[in-house]
């Protein structure tokens, strides 16, 4: 499990630098039907992957041992309307069980305004897919671990392999970056002294306009 993986790599400290890999700069592919595109929607050297199968592999080198988040910058393609599902290998192996099934969310936006039914009740707007790039750090699909996965990697040469399970997307970038530092409560609460305590009337937000 991921918790066991992190416990086994407790000696690793957060990395100090990031590595960026272009989606189209993969070193190998296996039955993916993936296509390199010189440009798509403002991003260069991207990967178009719409076969729902196969794998692509990227080579990279790290200057130091450290913990890294892995963030994918992608844009969903119209397919079945489900979340994008893939798996990830480091140096040819799954680093932990949870890496075998990773979910990337689709983006949605309102299609039109709030509707009103024949009883006068307001209904949420219909949803339509928002086809623009988003950056998502890989994390537990079940929400057991809230923070993004932290991958423990030694300095030197490595490979990262993505295996597609479901849906289609344009992959613009893979970024290995230091985990974002989370301040402890004592540090955060110390900054609250700058704010005045609210003393006005309660603020009520209606469920309908």
What are these regions (language model features)?
Residues 1-209:
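Extracytoplasmic
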């Amino acid at each position: 499990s991921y918790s066991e993986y992190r416990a086994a790599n407790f000696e690793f400290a957060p990395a100090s630098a990031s590595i960026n890999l272009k989606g189209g700069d993969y070193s190998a592919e296996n039955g993916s039907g993936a296509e390199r595109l010189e440009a798509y929607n403002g991003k260069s050297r991207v990967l178009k992957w719409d076969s729902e199968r196969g794998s692509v592999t990227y080579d990279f080198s790290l200057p130091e041992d450290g913990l890294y988040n892995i963030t994918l910058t992608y844009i969903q393609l119209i397919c079945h309307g489900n979340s994008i599902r893939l798996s990830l290998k480091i140096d040819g192996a799954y680093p932990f069980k949870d890496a075998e099934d990773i979910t990337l969310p689709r983006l949605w936006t309102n299609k039109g305004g709030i509707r009103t039914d024949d009883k006068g009740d307001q209904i949420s707007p219909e949803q339509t897919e928002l086809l623009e790039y988003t950056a998502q750090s890989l994390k537990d699909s079940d929400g057991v671990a809230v923070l993004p996965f932290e991958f423990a990697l030694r300095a030197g040469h490595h490979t990262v392999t993505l295996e597609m399970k479901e849906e289609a997307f344009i992959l613009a970038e893979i970024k290995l970056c230091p985990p974002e530092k989370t301040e402890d409560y004592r540090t955060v609460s110390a900054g609250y002294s700058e704010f005045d305590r609210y003393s006005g009337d309660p603020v009520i937000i209606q469920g309908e306009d």
